């Protein structure tokens, strides 16, 4: 501040002297003659005297200003009559000496004559120089003192023959109030040469308002100023809050209190730093008017390390000394009224009510469950404590399960509820396994089916049901005892693909079918001609079918006997064929006793030949 004030005084004296320069002749060095050593010594003497008087004047004015003009920091405001009686005389005396020395210096070397002839650099007074460009202001506060750095770009001097060495800059500075009104007269804070485009203003109040502008000067008679820029100096960075302490603890909360920082301006907020014993941390912002806070949503029975810092608009203070606090221990009670409200084959819907209120927070609930064989144990968790219902899925039908509910804090589980035993609903059996079909008899063709029971019967099986017939044709249905794992078909058509579908049934119903196909071989059959069937009454008044046929006359069609297949005629095919075998190749008729005399019957007669000794009628079961 002192150096800038001396520059201000010198600038003012230069300005008062330059008005007389136009009446003087050319300076040394501009009349065609080089300067002598004596001329250099004379100028040097004047400069030393100016500096000496300026420093003396600066000390006097600075001391007085500290008493009377306290808009700068580090000063003590006083009454206007606090100056000593000879202050004005001392200032005038030194100003007179400075003005004399300056006038002598300008007489020997005028910087910028106002006009004339005979080698003067400016035949006329130069026009106003343009103002500096891109004026920028930055402010910072360190400790309890603020500073402002002003920077600018050199103006574009175009269209005039101006020596840039004659260019100077003036930095103007004035205090403002918070509403932007100027509270004191602007002063020239710094005078800079043409190559100096940065100036600093120091020893300012933090969080104070100022106005700064920069002017361009040529020959001290021509000046253009930039637009004024307003700024607020940053606040001081506060010291750390003191005496951080605990007011109280609960399972999920800690009450804190602290004292104000010893060094502070206007605070923006406090920040509380919290780190738990497992290393996780979080921060809490607190209003600057408060010196206490309550930390919520903590984990019970957990140690926390806590510190606090203060913020101004200029940054954060150091953190306070940390303290270690442990929240209270809390174990919740058991959930109440735990019950099942819905069940189906694979899921159970459970509900409950929260435990009796305690001192701590419940975070979530869990359901532990297993089947009656304790083969596997499972756990279901609710997302939060607001949910007091659970739908347990993926269960097995017709199975007994045990369920138990627990309330959880952030650290531990409470007491378990009463255990609930619940059976899931029964469902139909799964598909019979490893269904296999093979030839059981070749003439007439029959199939033999074998299988294994379903993997899941869900109770006892009532029976099996097989649906079979020519593929994509009419089907027949038969029931099979639940203890049997084998079944023989009725006589089948030659050279035809048959389809068999096997279902298992429990008390719930039929499950899905296992399917297998079997194709009968193509055979060369012998059918006797002119087959006839008559219905008659026998000796005991029973109904008999008299079947007759003519002899087989085709060459090479010798038979060993005849087989007669017969069954009652039905629109819906339900019954099986009956077989009567006549081992006489010369037979021409046969009598068959039947029931249900009111039904019509279907009769098929075929000749057969006995197999040769090397023929296998029933090949062995594959893999057996």
Swiss-Prot record:
Its main location: secreted. SUPFAM superfamilies: Fibronectin type III (SSF49265). GO terms for cellular component: extracellular region. This is Fibronectin type III domain-containing protein 2. Residues 131-236, 240-330, 334-430, 431-524, 527-624 form the Fibronectin type-III domain. Keywords: Repeat, Secreted, Signal. Prismatic layer of shell (at protein level). It is found in: Secreted. Pfam families: fn3. InterPro entries: ECM_Regulatory_Proteins, FN3_dom, FN3_sf, Ig-like_fold. Residues 1-19 form the signal peptide.
């Amino acid at each position: 501040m002192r150096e800038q004030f001396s520059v201000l005084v010198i600038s003012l004296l230069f300005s008062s002297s330059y008005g007389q320069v136009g009446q003087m002749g050319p300076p040394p060095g501009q009349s065609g003659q080089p300067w002598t050593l004596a001329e250099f010594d004379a100028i040097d003497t004047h400069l030393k005297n100016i500096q000496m008087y300026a420093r003396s004047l600066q000390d006097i004015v600075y001391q007085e200003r500290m008493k009377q003009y306290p808009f700068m920091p580090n000063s003590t405001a006083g009454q206007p009559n606090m100056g000593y009686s000879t202050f004005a005389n001392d200032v005038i005396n030194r100003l007179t000496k400075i003005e004399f020395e300056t006038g002598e210096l300008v007489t020997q070397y005028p910087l910028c004559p106002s006009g004339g002839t005979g080698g003067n650099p400016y035949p006329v007074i130069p026009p106003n120089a343009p103002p500096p460009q891109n004026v920028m202001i930055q402010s910072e506060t360190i400790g309890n003192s603020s500073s402002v750095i002003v920077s600018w770009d050199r103006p574009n001097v175009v269209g005039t023959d101006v020596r840039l060495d004659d260019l100077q800059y003036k930095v103007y500075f004035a205090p403002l109030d918070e509403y932007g009104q100027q509270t004191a007269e602007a002063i020239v804070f710094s005078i800079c040469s043409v190559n100096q485009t940065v100036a600093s203003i120091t020893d300012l109040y933090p969080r104070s308002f100022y106005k700064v502008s920069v002017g361009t000067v040529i020959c001290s008679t021509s000046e253009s100023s930039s637009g004024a820029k307003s700024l607020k100096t940053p606040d001081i960075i506060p010291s750390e809050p003191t005496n951080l302490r605990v007011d109280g603890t609960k399972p999920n909360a800690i009450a804190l209190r602290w004292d104000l920082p010893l060094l502070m301006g206007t605070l923006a907020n406090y920040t509380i730093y919290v780190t738990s014993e497992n290393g996780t941390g979080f921060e809490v912002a607190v209003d600057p008017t408060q010196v206490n806070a309550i930390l919520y949503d903590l984990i019970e029975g957990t140690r926390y390390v806590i510190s606090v810092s203060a913020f101004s608009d200029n940054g954060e203070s150091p953190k306070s000394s940390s303290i270690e606090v442990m929240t209270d221990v809390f174990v919740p009670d058991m959930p109440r009224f735990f019950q099942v409200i819905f069940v189906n084959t694979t899921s159970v819907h459970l509900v409950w009510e929260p435990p009796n209120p305690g001192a701590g927070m419940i975070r979530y609930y869990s359901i532990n469950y297993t089947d009656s064989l304790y083969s596997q144990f499972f756990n279901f968790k609710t997302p939060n404590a607001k949910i007091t219902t659970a739908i347990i899925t993926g269960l097995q039908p017709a199975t007994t399960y045990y369920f138990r509910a627990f309330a959880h804090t952030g650290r531990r589980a409470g007491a378990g509820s009463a255990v609930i035993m619940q059976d899931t609903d029964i469902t139909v059996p799964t598909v019979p396994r490893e269904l296999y079909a093979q030839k059981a008899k070749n003439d007439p063709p029959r199939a033999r089916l074998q299988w294994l029971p379903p993997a899941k019967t869900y109770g006892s099986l009532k029976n099996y049901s097989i649906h079979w017939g020519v593929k994509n044709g009419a089907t027949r249905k038969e029931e099979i005892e639940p203890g049997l794992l084998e079944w023989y078909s009725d006589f089948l058509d030659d050279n035809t693909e048959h389809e068999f579908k096997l279902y298992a049934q429990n008390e719930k119903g039929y499950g899905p079918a296992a399917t297998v196909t079997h194709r009968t071989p193509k055979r060369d059959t012998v059918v006797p001609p002119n087959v006839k069937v008559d219905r008659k009454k026998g000796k005991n008044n029973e109904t008999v079918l008299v079947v007759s046929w003519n002899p087989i006359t085709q060459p090479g069609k010798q038979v060993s006997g005849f087989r007669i297949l017969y069954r009652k005629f039905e629109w819906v095919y339900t019954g099986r064929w009956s077989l009567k075998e006549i081992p006489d190749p010369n037979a021409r008729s046969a009598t068959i006793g039947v029931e249900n005399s009111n039904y019509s019957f279907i009769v098929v007669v075929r000749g057969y030949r006995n197999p040769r000794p090397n023929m296998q009628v029933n090949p062995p079961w594959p893999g057996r």
